[in-house]
């Protein structure tokens, strides 16, 4: 959900009102193809769905079903922002609402979404921010399993 929840601040629906919210993403104007970013361990299956609630309620939407392969390591935030940039570069109907940047509140991610820096730069930035958080949170963690890290 860390990345999927950001779709609510765009003109893409995260499948609210379907049997697979946050697994389906799309809009009536999306024409799915094989150019959408697809990290290792993920299948981006073309699909259509009709939400019974939320944005595009009752309208047929086309897009993708995000399927994780068994044992896949998945970084929802990074994949979501990568997909957002893809939609902004391929669909004039795609909009990032002002509330999106308020929720992101990170200048490096904002610059990536605006097309000003590469994915490698934002990926390293997020990795660094996660490591800083882990160091701060370490004294409060009650378990030994390491939180997910970007490899």
Name these PLM-found stretches:
Residues 18-127:
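Conserved functional hotspot residues or short segments at active or partner-binding sites
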Residues 113-151:
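C-terminal regions of mature proteins
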């Amino acid at each position: 959900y860390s990345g999927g929840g950001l779709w609510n601040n765009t003109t893409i629906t995260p499948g609210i009102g379907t049997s697979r919210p946050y697994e389906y993403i799309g809009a009536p104007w999306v024409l799915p193809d094989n150019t959408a970013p697809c990290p290792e361990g993920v299948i981006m299956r073309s699909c259509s769905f009709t939400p019974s609630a939320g944005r595009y309620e009752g309208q047929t939407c086309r897009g993708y079903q995000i399927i994780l392969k068994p044992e896949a390591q998945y970084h929802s935030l990074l994949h979501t922002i990568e997909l957002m940039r893809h939609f902004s570069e391929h669909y004039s109907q795609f909009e990032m609402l002002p509330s999106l940047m308020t929720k992101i509140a990170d200048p490096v991610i904002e610059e990536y979404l605006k097309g000003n820096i590469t994915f490698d730069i934002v990926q390293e930035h997020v990795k660094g921010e996660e490591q800083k958080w882990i160091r701060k949170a370490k004294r409060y963690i009650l378990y030994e399993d390491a939180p997910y890290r970007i490899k």
